[in-house]
Amino acid sequence: MSSLISFIFLFLFSFLTSFKASAQDPFYLNHYCPNTTTYSRFSTYSTNLRTLLSSFASRNASYSTGFQNVTVGQTPDLVTGLFLCRGDLSPEVCSNCVAFSVDEALTRCPSQREAVFYYEECILRYSDKNILSTAITNEGEFILSNTNTISPNQSQINQFIVLVQSNMNQAAMEAANSSRKFSTIKTELTELQTLYGLVQCTPDLTSQDCLRCLTRSINRMPLSRIGARQFWPSCNSRYELYSFYNETTIGTPSPPPPPSPSRAN
């Protein structure tokens, strides 16, 4: 493992140098809004969608839990939406991210009935279908990874993949069995290198659906890289060789979200 340690250190050093240089970049990551179904600007659906987005940006939104879902209107103009903030972040950071994503939503997806927006701190999602309590792993995928492989040696790559996968799978089990559907890991690979991981599902999923979603998410990541993340609308996974989450808040979980969705009229 000694040669693997040196490769980890070398690539991590070069990555952290570039990471610090881009620390001030916007926290927007990606979005997905297919043109399969659309709406017109002055339609009932448009009004309902704006009502839903306004409720997410209001003072009464569930920023303290980091998760909220809302349904507005009646079929065929019914809109269902949710936001999910990263589980280690404060209500203030959650609020800022949700407000920012709401403000940009109709600019990025001006006429699509279905959309998901990925940010560093939160996810915003809405649809004309019932998206609550349903794990989505067949659309809206987004993968981001470091370009550096952990080592040019295949044996060392295989060792690293086993370590990452086993630790991330453990985190997935813990998340699936928690009320917040969120978990982190911190594992010392060597005296000099530590693996950090984070997994999260929307809390409306069952334990089984959350675990299934996270397992697929972990398997979709290129685990030979020195860092990667994968997003679906229902769950996401990330691992790095540097600390990227707020460790001080992990030990004090927020209260679980309400069991049933709220409804804005």
From Swiss-Prot:
Residues of this chain annotated as glycosylated in UniProt: 35, 60, 69, 153, 177, 246
Keyword Secreted belongs to the record: yes
Gene3D superfamilies documented for this protein: Gnk2 domain, C-X8-C-X2-C motif (3.30.430.20)
Keywords (A to Z) from UniProt: Glycoprotein, Receptor, Repeat, Secreted, Signal
Domain Gnk2-homologous intervals: 27-131, 142-244
Signal peptide location: 1-23
InterPro entries the UniProt entry points to: GNK2, GNK2_sf
A cellular-component GO term for this protein: apoplast
Gene Ontology annotations of biological process type: programmed cell death; response to salicylic acid; systemic acquired resistance
Induction context: By salicylic acid (SA).
Cellular compartments annotated: Secreted
Family: Belongs to the protein kinase superfamily. Ser/Thr protein kinase family. CRK subfamily.
PANTHER family from the UniProt entry: CYSTEINE-RICH RECEPTOR-LIKE PROTEIN KINASE 9-RELATED, CYSTEINE-RICH REPEAT SECRETORY PROTEIN
Name this protein carries in UniProt: Putative cysteine-rich receptor-like protein kinase 9
Organism for this UniProt entry: Arabidopsis thaliana (Mouse-ear cress)
